[in-house]
């Protein structure tokens, strides 16, 4: 009993240490204007909720919500804007900063007079990230039944997050999606290891909440059902009735979470859907990458290696060789895709009615380019964690091989959803690692296991040598 209390206390201290490291890394970043990057997407919706009680499409509305009530929208999921609203209720200074930023975006005030203040969100981000790290560590410990792996995985996950501290200092969704996914993946591991209806229900609730944070996670619903079936039928040899009941329990819990949002969208917007225009906009921007030339295709593989790839390629081939991969350059794939999207919106008003025709035309003319280009995009998106990624990615590969050889299928099931999302982002989005931070979980867990096994083997050899010498 005393050992358990001590272990719990040590883990609490570890959690506080992780939080202290992450919150410090975020808070020491230079202050950001709240109109920078994609922050206005969510801040405008929060503003509309605060001042009009309307969940809108934010900056994608055609009305100035500082002057008139915006129409209801469903472009973004509701979780993150509501978190911003909660932060504005808790901190009046942040509320004033949000209002000023939105008013400046709509040219109602000068942006120079707005306060670059988002501390409550920064603290919230650090708390979410810490929860995600603990979930990764717990999942690794559960999969490999090793206390050492818990500590190693937690440390590696923290190290992998620090390079993105600047990203987390923006008022955007990355920290929340990372956290919710990591917790959902832990719940999935527990449910697959010891299947029970109650555990599967929790998995469904968490993955449903994830969809309300970022709609692209909708694709994981059938993936998780597939994993439940695969685990039950192939690994546990459970009866089909049991497997079916667990699959239905997941689906029911998932629908309980997203159902109210679907009903709200049907009543307020007139559409039975989770989102509108979101997927169409992303895919239209993704099609711009299909113009990638042969040199860009080949150089993408060394170029995307964190820390070393970009300077080496720029030195050997010049900065213009991969300039289209850098989103802020005028001729980047990002700007070309965004410009095409904006022109379509200007000409037609909406993208969803056009997307089937655009997909048909793209696949008819350049399907082979689309498939080939997805390879470097997935490769580039895979290298999460900055410099740490140079170690985490190969160690993850080793862990996958070891998992097959040593019958650790639970690790492969744990990794599968994040790998599916990597492929999805390469197919319908872009190559930026910010969308694939959920890979840190399986990467850190796998790397921790490999390191622990190497250390254990070295310790055994050392003891054997000492025994033989004596």
What do these predicted regions represent?
Residues 119-144, 183-187, 395-398:
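Transmembrane-helix motifs of polytopic, lipid-linked glycan transferases
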Residues 95-115, 133-160, 178-179, 193-198, ...:
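Transmembrane-helix signature of polytopic, membrane-embedded enzymes
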Residues 37, 121-128, 156, 163-188, ...:
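Multi-pass, polyprenyl lipid-linked donor-dependent membrane glycosyltransferases
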Residues 144, 184-202, 210, 230-234, ...:
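Membrane-interface transmembrane helices that cradle and orient dolichyl/undecaprenyl
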Residues 155, 199-214, 253-257:
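Membrane-interface alpha helices of multi-pass inner-membrane proteins
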Residues 74, 78-85, 90-134, 167, ...:
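Loop-to-helix entry region of an early transmembrane alpha helix in multi-pass inner-membrane enzymes
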Residues 274-370:
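Membrane-proximal stem/loop segments at transmembrane-domain junctions that anchor or position
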Residues 115-127, 343-415:
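Membrane-interface anchor segments at the N-terminal boundary of transmembrane helices
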